[in-house]
UniProtKB/Swiss-Prot annotation:
Organism, scientific name: Chlorobium phaeobacteroides (strain BS1)
Job of this protein: Binds to DNA and alters its conformation. May be involved in regulation of gene expression, nucleoid organization and DNA protection.
Membership in a protein family: Belongs to the YbaB/EbfC family.
UniProt-recorded name of the protein: Nucleoid-associated protein Cphamn1_1179
Cellular component aspect of the GO annotation: bacterial nucleoid; cytosol
Length: 111
């Protein structure tokens, strides 16, 4: 039975680390927009799951409960889109390295 080559394993780990740093930089650049109420409320989030902005159509400001519900729905929609984009970036970076797709299950992004 062949012994694993630890130098090769270390090299792979270093390459994976560099790719993950690249992914982190890409996630900072990604934005996703979610909307609710037919676009009456829009939320923009980053690929790192941070809310960047909320836009509310002034026409709906009379109904606070509806505004609150729509803000929650818009933010959740945007976060879901951002999580999908983050998974795509991680999948591209992980392709073939350290288990590829199976490794991504450990990140639990957006789940």
């Amino acid at each position: 039975m062949a012994m694993p080559n630890f130098n090769d394993m270390m090299k792979q780990l270093q390459q994976a680390g560099a790719k993950m740093q690249d992914v982190q930089k890409q996630l900072e650049k990604i934005t996703a927009v979610g909307d609710a109420g037919g676009g009456m409320v829009k939320a923009t989030v980053s690929g790192k799951q941070k809310v960047l902005s909320i836009a509310i159509d002034p026409e709906i400001l009379d109904d606070i409960e509806m505004v609150q519900d729509l803000v929650v729905a818009a933010v959740n929609a945007a976060l879901e889109k951002a999580a999908d984009l983050a998974r795509e970036e991680l999948s591209k970076a992980a392709g073939g390295m350290l288990g590829g797709e199976d490794m991504l299950k450990n990140f639990n992004i957006g789940q």
